[in-house]
A protein has these predicted regions:
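The transition from N-terminal targeting/processing segments to the mature protein
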Residues: 15-130
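N-terminal chloroplast transit peptides
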Residues: 1-22
Length: 130
């Protein structure tokens, strides 16, 4: 027998104007050219380790993870990469070879955390890109 939950509101298809907004590409977020990539890397390492330690529990492996992510970030920045999306992809790709077996985290969580920290530093809302 089919049961219908009447407490759930009916969902209608979005209006054409809303649908058009949903199909618009998300504009890229570009970081300013690096003035001191090593200093940026140290800032990122410290912030990422603090985030890792706060998110679950402080672990020795968090320092290694933050150091590795910061190294990738610095190298990418020194090679001229300023696009946030490309930086995130580079971190995901290169962190895949990292052994996360002693951690609660994985490469996607690390790349997303880096993205959030960078957006926050730029004053961009993580939720809505504004």
């Amino acid at each position: 027998m089919l049961k219908v939950n009447l407490s759930v509101p009916l969902r209608f298809p979005p209006r054409p104007s809303a649908l058009k907004k949903m199909t618009q590409p998300i504009p890229p977020i570009t970081l300013p050219p690096p003035e001191n990539p090593l200093l940026e890397g140290e800032w990122l390492r410290e912030r990422l380790q603090r985030w890792l330690d706060t998110e679950f529990i402080p672990e020795a492996v968090n320092q290694n993870i933050a150091q590795r992510a910061a190294q990738i970030f610095v190298r990418q920045r020194m090679e001229g990469e300023n696009d946030l999306g490309s930086l995130v992809i580079a971190i995901v790709t290169e962190m895949q070879s990292y052994d996360f077996s002693n951690s609660f985290y994985g490469e996607f969580a690390i790349a997303n955390a880096v993205s959030d920290l960078l957006l926050e530093s730029l004053g961009i809302d993580k939720c809505c890109g504004q």
